[in-house]
Amino acid sequence: SALLQFDATGDERFLELGRSNTIERMASHVTHIGVHDHGFNNVSTYGNLRRLVLEGRLPRNEWELAFYELALKVSGAVQAARWGVTSDGTGYVCSFNGPHSLFCDTIRSMRALALSHRLGHRLQGENDLSISLLDRLVQHARTTAKYNVFYGEGRDTYDVWGRVAHEAVFNRNDGRFRTPATHQGYSAFSTWTRGLAWIMSGYTEELEFLDTIADADLDPLGGRADIEAMMLRAARASCDFYIENTPADGVPYWDTGAPGLAAMGDYLDRPADPYNDHEPVDSSAAAIACQGLLRLGRYLLDRGDPAGEQYRHAGLTVLRTLLREPYLATDPGHQGLLLHSVYHRPRGWDHIPPGRRIPCGEAVMWGDYHLVEAALYASRLAA
């Protein structure tokens, strides 16, 4: 968030904070072989620093730029090496749960592979096998779209257009898909809304990335038309589900199937209530989803599809809500920016204030980061 704060304000205190902490603390994340988070951790640090250099916001020092780019090359390759194979011949980047596990979140980490590929890097495997990071990105996107996103096609009793499963579980003996699952959501058959938001933002971002790739590079992977159609379908389905299952102000409750929602009447027809007694909202999900809606709206409008207006307006509605109380922190003593975020409701990791029955009033790092990122994105669209 510090680097984005500098981007937004020009306050060099935040630049120094972000740059020094990246250099001092992030090397272990570049080579971390046990997580699915490279796109979150490294693109938001080394990636933003590289972008600021290329935009002329920082003095151009070739060695400094090479340092950031080396980190991004390595990060994308390390992430791509955490690989599982399915029975249908495709693959996926495994979650930190293990080789059986595909998280919906990881679609946002594909930007680590995308940047590494754009920088001309490949993953070197056994016997010096040279592995395309673009190929692994597309395979992961296909597998996630097939097993984590639902399209109302009767895959199970609760299959509706745009539902998202947090996790897809595979049998590692033969690679066959076994079941949807969740860890931070309520049920495998409901939708954890932050996971939904990762799908929304991840696929729309990768659609933009495809615009930078030559047709010849996509032809061996199925071709541009097929790949774009797959990603656009997942993006539209998830964004439609978000709009349909979120209160009128654009801030969702933490899971669409959370049991306490049944006691809240027509909760979708009014603004979300972070101070209710039944289920918490997750403003961090809204901050992430906001960007997905705005990006999808722009993508469609740029192609002459008027349906993009609905998504653009929905994204602006979400952003307008988050930049006001009760979501925007106004107490100078509070360390966060975006209030009423949730980390892990099932495990009880979220603070419940005295006199309250549910978590409220706190911020999380990814909520703050994505709020600032969404605001910067919207300001660039308006420029």
Which residues does each predicted region cover?
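Glycan-recognition and catalytic cores of secretory/periplasmic carbohydrate-active enzymes
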Residues: 1-383
